């Protein structure tokens, strides 16, 4: 039996950690839809049990996207973990595990800008989330935000000025622009397909494409605005940042860090994966930070195995 397990659950599946110094001991590719997050997660846990039939632990912490907003029953998930792995369980958000992986019990703001976007801070016995509202209402600066803005900008530039460089690059990846309105109306273009266009925008920016440079600069700025607001709300100067946009785009990262510097915030890259934060929370349910998370409804702990 393993003492503790940390499970990181994202939109594409889950990763399992048993040692902070080692890579994931298991990876389950099992997409988690927003509509069926709880059922998809439980199915992924069953897949993990089949892949690792001898896996057991005294306590598991699972950090998942959508914990707070998608109607997931923490009690149902903890019951499955107890049944499958014989373990006590802590269920929380991946924003909490990302924060804990970097800051532990220290104070600061974790900003993750990937397919989605959010800032989460803890300081002075206060917790604050900014954004993380999904593609329809938020995710400012995210890969999806970049991809959609690029599609809109590409069509607009082509129609108004005849500049088709960005449009041609996007069409090469996602098909003719003339088909986009119909595909959006039929919901045939997924959030992940739109988000994947951010990589093309980043590539074009490196070759000097002006539209791409402007989009990525704005992405960094709006992401930084979330960080600044979050830091101000809890009263901290420390920011950790990560995610595919900030780590993969020099232009977005540059504008992000410039805004933070203008507000005298100290920034450092998030190094440890969220799953390590989950592992550390599993091991630390008696410490004051984890007790605070539970008291604020940011984590659910079922201590009856």
Regions from the language model: what does each represent?
Residues 1-57, 102-109, 151-305:
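ATP-binding/phosphotransfer module of carbohydrate and carboxylate kinases, centering on a glycine-rich
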Residues 56-58, 87-88:
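Short acidic capping loops at alpha-helix termini that bridge into adjacent secondary structure
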Residues 61:
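FAD-binding subdomain of flavoenzyme oxidoreductases
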Residues 64, 68-164, 298-305:
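Phosphate-binding/catalytic loop of phosphoryl-transfer enzymes
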């Amino acid at each position: 039996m393993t003492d503790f397990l940390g499970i990181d659950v994202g939109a594409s599946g889950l990763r399992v950690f048993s040692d902070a110094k080692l890579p994931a001991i298991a990876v389950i590719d099992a997409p988690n839809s927003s509509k069926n997050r709880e059922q998809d997660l439980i199915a992924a846990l069953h897949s993990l049990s089949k892949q690792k039939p001898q896996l057991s632990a005294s306590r598991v912490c699972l950090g998942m996207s959508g914990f707070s907003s998608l109607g997931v029953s923490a009690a149902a998930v903890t019951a499955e973990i107890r049944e499958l792995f014989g373990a006590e369980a802590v269920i929380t958000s991946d924003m909490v595990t990302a924060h804990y992986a970097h800051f532990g019990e220290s104070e600061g703001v974790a900003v993750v800008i990937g397919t989605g976007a959010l800032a989460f801070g803890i300081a002075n016995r206060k917790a604050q989330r900014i954004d993380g509202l999904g593609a329809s209402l938020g995710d400012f600066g995210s890969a999806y935000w970049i991809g959609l803005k690029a599609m809109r900008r590409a069509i607009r530039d082509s129609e108004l000025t005849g500049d088709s460089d960005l449009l041609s690059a996007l069409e090469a990846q996602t098909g003719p622009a003339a088909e986009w309105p119909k595909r959006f109306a039929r919901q045939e273009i997924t959030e992940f397909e739109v988000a994947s266009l951010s990589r093309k925008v980043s590539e074009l920016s490196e070759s000097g494409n002006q539209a791409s440079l402007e989009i990525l600069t704005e992405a960094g700025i709006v992401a930084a605005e979330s960080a600044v607001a979050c830091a101000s709300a809890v009263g901290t100067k420390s920011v950790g940042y990560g995610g595919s946009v900030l780590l993969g785009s020099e232009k977005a990262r540059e504008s992000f860090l410039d805004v933070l510097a203008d507000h005298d915030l100290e920034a450092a890259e998030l190094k440890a994966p969220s799953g390590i934060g989950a592992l550390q929370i599993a091991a630390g349910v008696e410490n004051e930070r984890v007790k605070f998370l539970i008291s604020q409804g940011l984590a659910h702990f079922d201590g009856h195995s």
